[in-house]
Amino acid sequence: MKTNTAATQGLFTFVSSQSSEHRLSTYQGRFVCRYAYGRAMESLVQGEKGQDFVGVHMDGNSCNFVLCDGVGQSYQGDFAARFLGNTLLDWLGTTREWSSAAFTSFMQEITASASEQLKQLTPPGEVPTLLREVLEDKQRLGSQTMYICGRIELPTARKRQGRIWMAWQGDSRLRFWKNNAEISEYFHETMLTNERWSTLTGPVGGSPHVYQTRLEYGLPMRLQLYTDGLDDLDPIRELLPDEQIQILLDAPHTGGLEDDAAFLELQW
């Protein structure tokens, strides 16, 4: 597997391409980060974009991350995933307002820009009239995506307490280990299929879920995020070697992935 050692001053960024696969890779700095992206075999064969998104940016002791799963039944779900993923990565690196109310307000404010950009994605001219009408109806209802985003600020010898902040809507997986014991139960009942973000209305199905806690110095932790294309990981609690995760991404047992898959794992 590809390994990236710590870059100058601990800077590292990865943003997935929805038009290509990215085999499982590892970055090692203050965090150990494993990341990957794969399209469903159907999308790959037809040359279509994937509808998932994963992005991570590290700068020394801090890490910002986003994972999105575009809603296929909405109009251009890949657009919502890409737009929201990039927008949240920027926001995480600049905001000083971490309250639930501030985040919910931000998620509503960005719909104007998203809707304006979505209007530029007109259905291709060669599609049949009936299909064009269906696509235009979908376009008026907006593009939607599920998401998980967050920021980690590591504790240090001088600053003994760090923190992790996360927000999400939807049923993508969010799993958390503290000192090798999984403590993900808090998140399970809030990972709801009917919740997502829309370019038209912002949060759908309720307000975003926001979680924040302190991080203790010297306590090993692991955070794992993935979309439902990798649901084979659901029952697995132990730390898997790279080769086994890549097998799940290659999915030889089903002739390729049945759904798009984005994967991000952080250890510190």
Task: Tell me what each language-model feature is.
Residues 86-126, 235-259:
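Helix-loop-helix
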Residues 47-58, 139-165, 187-227, 231-235:
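Acidic loop->beta-strand submotif enriched in PP2C/PPM serine/threonine phosphatases
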Residues 65-69, 167-169, 224-226:
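Short hydrophobic beta-strand that contains or immediately precedes a catalytic carboxylate
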Residues 42-47, 137-140, 253-254:
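Short Gly/Pro-enriched turn/cap motifs at secondary-structure boundaries
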Residues 176-185, 189:
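A short, surface-exposed interaction/processing loop segment used at functional sites
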Residues 2-92, 172, 205-208, 212-213:
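N-terminal entry segment of metal-dependent catalytic domains or homologous docking segments
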Residues 101-178, 206-217:
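Catalytic core of PPM/PP2C metal-dependent serine/threonine phosphatase domains
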